[in-house]
């Protein structure tokens, strides 16, 4: 039986959190997984947490940030709390359908499996606006050249970890905003974990909270600090 934790960072997701959780639970129950879902509310100012709790699903756990601390902070809290053999973090909008986890779980010898929108075999059902796509490609190009070569898409919010890898990597994560994905992949490389990139299905949502230009510059700044901070980070 597959043992799986799913971490969902959520900020002002009251319009879809219930449907997201119902979709995930229906899938996991149908597959008869041993599972837990961890919702990390990142200081939402709407009814996200209230709605999620009112569903009263026994296998959902909740963490609450009293103020908005960033996606990276929220994912880190959830990953360090997770208890199952495999740990997935997924965006609250399910831009990558939960069923895509089946592809990743087929590679049992991999420590970190990265959902990718850029690989051959990926399928983009709804594209981002062109300025977002080009901005994302530019960021990915720089990241590919400077930090994590051979990973084509670092920013897709659908990544699977073995528990042991997740605990070691996220315990030393320092970037708390949207650039955290790059840091955890860099750390995975530094620690010598086996990384695989898997093509997935993905759809853009018009109300995405990613601000490509402002957050793009922040990611680049975070990269500079990260390289200096983790230069000597490796498994002892």
Regions found by a protein language model. Name each.
Residues 13-28:
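Short, well-formed alpha-helical segments that are part of the catalytic scaffolds
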Residues 35-38, 49-81:
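Conserved donor nucleotide-binding strand/loop of the catalytic core
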Residues 3-5, 36, 183:
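Cell-envelope/extracellular polymer assembly enzymes that use nucleotide-activated donors
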Residues 13-16, 44, 71, 97:
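Donor nucleotide-sugar binding loop of glycosyltransferases
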Residues 65-81, 86, 98-178, 204-214, ...:
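Acceptor/aglycone-binding surface of glycosyltransferases and processive sugar-polymer synthases
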Residues 180-187:
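Short active-site alpha-helical segment characteristic of glycosyltransferases
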Residues 41-49, 94:
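A conserved acidic beta->alpha catalytic loop
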């Amino acid at each position: 039986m597959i043992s799986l934790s799913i971490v969902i960072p959520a900020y002002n997701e009251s319009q879809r959190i219930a449907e997201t959780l119902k979709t995930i639970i229906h899938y996991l129950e149908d597959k008869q997984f041993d599972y837990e879902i961890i919702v990390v509310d990142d200081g939402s100012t709407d009814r996200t947490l209230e709605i999620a709790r009112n569903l009263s699903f026994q296998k959902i756990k909740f963490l609450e940030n009293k103020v908005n601390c960033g996606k990276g902070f929220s994912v880190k809290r959830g990953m360090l709390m997770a208890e199952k053999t495999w740990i997935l973090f997924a965006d609250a909008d399910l831009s990558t359908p939960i069923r895509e986890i089946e592809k990743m779980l087929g590679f049992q010898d991999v420590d970190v499996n990265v959902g990718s929108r850029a690989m051959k075999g990926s399928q983009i059902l709804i594209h981002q606006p062109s300025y977002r796509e080009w901005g994302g490609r530019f960021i990915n190009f720089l990241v590919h050249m400077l930090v994590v070569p051979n990973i084509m898409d670092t920013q897709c919010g659908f990544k699977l970890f073995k528990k042991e890898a997740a605990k070691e990597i996220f315990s030393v994560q320092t970037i708390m905003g949207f650039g955290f994905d790059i840091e955890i992949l860099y750390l995975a490389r530094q620690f010598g974990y086996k990384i695989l990139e898997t093509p997935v299905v993905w759809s853009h949502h018009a109300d995405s909270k990613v601000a490509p230009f402002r957050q793009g510059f922040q990611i680049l700044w975070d990269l500079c600090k990260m390289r200096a901070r983790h230069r000597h980070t490796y498994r002892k």
